[in-house]
Amino acid sequence: MKQITLHVYQSLDGCPVGADKHFDAAAEASCCVLIDEETYLRIYLNHLGWPLTAKETLVVTDGCIDLTEKERVRFVTGDAAAELRGIKADGEGTVTAYGAETGALLLDNGLADEIVVITVPVLVGGGEKALECGLNDDRTWVVRSSKVLEDGKIRTVYGRVCP
């Protein structure tokens, strides 16, 4: 069974900040990448093309917005939670996930096995949060590791406690 690891990048006050080389390294080590439509569009527009060509990228979206016809991009539409359960059950490896909507989908449906939070030492302000979801159950997460990175960021890994 695949493990899904959600990567969250946030400021000290919990606001979203962009992913960096730490995400790139995780994506490279995984069997595939899982992102939402907004993240897909942002990556495509920032790179003027699709940079993640070494492995399959799954994009959770309401419809096909394929800008990368010749690359390894697959769109997850319809019942995304059910499709992701099937992907998770098929084979081994780690799925590296990123994006606010992706995070909410994974956490609201009990699909994330691990959360890696990179906290950047800045205050952003505003009402938007890096991770917003409607958790309404009693899932428990424990700290597996915490490390200060060379650039002053803090990397904390949380693992889900299974009942």
Per-segment meaning from a language model:
Residues 1-163:
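Enzymes that bind and transform nitrogen-containing heteroaromatic metabolites
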